[in-house]
Amino acid sequence: MTLAKIELLKQLLRDNEAKTVLKQTTVDQYNIIRKFNTSRIEKNPSLRMKWAMCSNFPLALTKGDMANRIPLEYKGIQLKTNAEDIGTKGQMCSIAAVTWWNTYGPIGDTEGFEKVYESFFLRKMRLDNATWGRITFGPVERVRKRVLLNPLTKEMPPDEASNVIMEILFPKEAGIPRESTWIHRELIKEKREKLKGTMITPIVLAYMLERELVARRRFLPVAGATSAEFIEMLHCLQGENWRQIYHPGGNKLTESRSQSMIVACRKIIRRSIVASNPLELAVEIANKTVIDTEPLKSCLTAIDGGDVACDIIRAALGLKIRQRQRFGRLELKRISGRGFKNDEEILIGNGTIQKIGIWDGEEEFHVRCGECRGILKKSKMRMEKLLINSAKKEDMKDLIILCMVFSQDTRMFQGVRGEINFLNRAGQLLSPMYQLQRYFLNRSNDLFDQWGYEESPKASELHGINELMNASDYTLKGVVVTKNVIDDFSSTETEKVSITKNLSLIKRTGEVIMGANDVSELESQAQLMITYDTPKMWEMGTTKELVQNTYQWVLKNLVTLKAQFLLGKEDMFQWDAFEAFESIIPQKMAGQYSGFARAVLKQMRDQEVMKTDQFIKLLPFCFSPPKLRSNGEPYQFLRLVLKGGGENFIEVRKGSPLFSYNPQTEVLTICGRMMSLKGKIEDEERNRSMGNAVLAGFLVSGKYDPDLGDFKTIEELEKLKPGEKANILLYQGKPVKVVKRKRYSALSNDISQGIKRQRMTVESMGWALS
């Protein structure tokens, strides 16, 4: 600045007005610079933000009642100024004002927040109820795996989720729902109810719903548990040299759905392989299987992974599967090479000759068994090299054995010492390669003794492994353990495969990648309810599953069954559904239970006292030919015991864990699942809970009497004393006066009159059912 300019400035400052303007309007304010800047594009956004936030009052408050609630200062800290922001015309305030507002500001209406941000509140619940253990320091072996980032309410493909979200938020604009959308109607209905009346913008609702329904998966380095409940807290559970023990609170719905899907697929395959056409039966059962309220096909489409059984059912239903090959517990993915199969006769160690398909050609595979991963190189009848990572001894041992068998090494064939005639759960003889697999998993010493040992490698990152799966100076020939991490399969590619009649999956190249023999024979209890809507499958289930499926079928066909019963059609007991139910009744009791159940139902029909819940309860027990006492009388029971012991019984005259009925709500509870009978019980029968078909214990004594007041409800009628009168609406809505009987001797007469009307109605439609 020149001397002349300084003189001019001093002269200007002598003018009080000019001095005030210059003092109050600082030219270093960013907003003023921006206002007179010709360019609208921000040249350096980062610098702009830093510059703004370094000033005392970088924020602008919109004028109004809310802004007035913030004081000028709090405990010596200035929160705002009365100066006006030139750019926004708002009041200027400091960043401390935000902290003050969050801490001391008014609390608005938060109704609906928990419903909208449910996934965040559930995360907080899991965190609040979590158990934290100690932190351990030291090297952590983390493996890159494809993991789900956060738990989901219900996993589904993105396009399906967008249709469901549209149906929840904009039902009028969504149009006619597709079948794939409509199968989620329970979820749609539940979410609509929850979100009704919330004042949050639809875009936020849509984002939060997407977070609950669409899976976000990433390849992340993980040590230990990989379920979404752990992955959402991964940042505070492990690092390169530390680990924190943590167990989340709450339940794991996604895992339950996936686990139930695996259980269902395994059972379907186990049932199908004994059929004349396994593929046809598997498709039929799979299309009629529901997990919770969702079709199995929808689960298989939405949920990533599963096991061999899931992939076989996917292929049967025409869905794509991940690029994998299976050999029992061993999972393989080809890295390079190609093999060609030729049938050869092989002399094995026990002196027998087996015809086996031998693979010729050099091949390299990425292999996995449980948590143990490795790289396998093989040629014709020889395992060249197997490099594995350190894991649980059981997984390491199984991986080594399965790779030795899969390689069809001559030493493996020579290691057989005993019989290799193994059967699957269906009682079918396994093929030779699966016989060998089963044999050596049970008798590993035969294989390791024959295999031989060699000196361990000298490299620092490699070590040998002995027959006890311990690090050693000598190692099983060709087998090496690396201290480095072998990452999990990273491919996400899917492919369409063809499936044979016997449930073998074949690639376009003709290579068999898995089959029914690769399905695990482990049996486990499903965490969610599985419904197989076909009697062909029911006998495979547990007692509870069979009870549930049978009674569900009875409810579905109740009108037909009831009509046939009232018309006296005895062949009505011979349904396929009841044949499956018979398999859970102890054999020596089946005839006695049938005789008893048929006698009770006949008595109900003859005395014309229809009790729908009792009819449903006893009907499945009537399948077997009835067995009576020597005098022709039926055996009597208060409890009908089923196979399996424990809670597997049905009480005849009261509720039990398997079957109970609430006449007030007209709800049946079958194995814990509620099923409504509303609309399936006639008004006359409903009133019989008070005594009879018309009104047990009451006599219709005339027309409506205004002096007696309003119409009484059934509950109020029960409180009347003998001889008292009241107005009621009869079952067809007819207003009448009734008097409570002093004696109950006419009870059966009341009942029979009502039932006769019901029976006449059924008989009039009998021609349609004959």
Curated annotation (Swiss-Prot):
- What is the first-listed, main subcellular location in coarse terms? virion
Q: What family is this?
A: Belongs to the influenza viruses PB2 family.
Q: What does the record give under GO molecular function?
A: RNA binding; RNA-directed RNA polymerase activity
Motif location (Nuclear localization signal)? 740-743
Q: Write out the function statement from the record.
A: Plays an essential role in transcription initiation and cap-stealing mechanism, in which cellular capped pre-mRNAs are used to generate primers for viral transcription. Recognizes and binds a wide range of cap structures of target pre-RNAs which are subsequently cleaved after 10-13 nucleotides by the viral protein PA. Plays a role in the initiation of the viral genome replication and modulates the activity of the ribonucleoprotein (RNP) complex.
* Record keywords: Cap snatching, Eukaryotic host gene expression shutoff by virus, Eukaryotic host transcription shutoff by virus, Host gene expression shutoff by virus, Host nucleus, Host-virus interaction, Inhibition of host RNA polymerase II by virus, mRNA capping, mRNA processing, Viral transcription, Virion
Q: Name one GO biological process term.
A: viral RNA genome replication
Where found?
Virion; Host nucleus
A single Gene Ontology CC annotation of this entry is: virion component
Quote the Pfam families the UniProt record gives: Flu_PB2_1st, Flu_PB2_2nd, Flu_PB2_3rd, Flu_PB2_4th, Flu_PB2_5th, Flu_PB2_6th, Flu_PB2_7th
Protein name listed in UniProt: Polymerase basic protein 2
Species of origin reads: Influenza B virus (strain B/Panama/45/1990)
InterPro entries recorded: Flu_PB2_2nd, Flu_PB2_6th, Flu_PB2_C, Flu_PB2_CAP-bd, Flu_PB2_middle, Flu_PB2_N, INV_PB2, PB2_helical
Q: How the protein assembles, per its UniProt entry?
A: Influenza RNA polymerase is composed of three subunits: PB1, PB2 and PA. Interacts (via N-terminus) with PB1 (via C-terminus). Interacts with nucleoprotein NP (via N-terminus).
